[in-house]
Amino acid sequence: MKKIVVMSDSHGYHQMINRVKELEPDGDYYVHCGDSEAETYMMQDWLCVKGNNDWYSDFPNQIKFKVEDLNFLVAHGHRFGYMDRETSMIYTLQEANCDVLLSGHTHVPMYKEVDGCTLINPGSTTLPRGGSNRSYCVIYVEGK
């Protein structure tokens, strides 16, 4: 079984990036869904994408990776707009031939399965919105 630790929208609170790793030291993958506002060297152990507040970062806009039989796509949520966001997310995921989309931006945790697609937003570790608490998520993937 593989363990994926996912966070997003830490917005310069670099100690939270370290804290999540301390809380989840046995992760096989560490993923940051953007708006880390961190220098590249701080994210060496992370799969990290560029968010709308990562102005000077050289992180990619999206990352694809595979764990067991699942294909993951990581992209910050600002790419999906606000009108009909879910449709845009599903379309992007299907175009990338992936099963799971990990995204941030809204600072609100979300887990949703739609049309064979899984959409996950871990929320924010520092600036939660919509009545949510500070959060990150852990995903366990079992092999066949």
Per-segment meaning from a language model:
Residues W46-C48, L101, L119-N121:
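Conserved beta-strand scaffold positions in the cores of enzyme catalytic domains, especially
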Residues V49-N52, Y56-N97:
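Helix-adjacent hinge/juxtasegments
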Residues K3-H11, N71-H78, T118-G123:
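Active-site-proximal beta-strand elements of phosphoester/diester hydrolases
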Residues M16-N18, V67-E68, E95-N97, I120-K144:
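Binuclear metal-dependent phosphoesterase catalytic core
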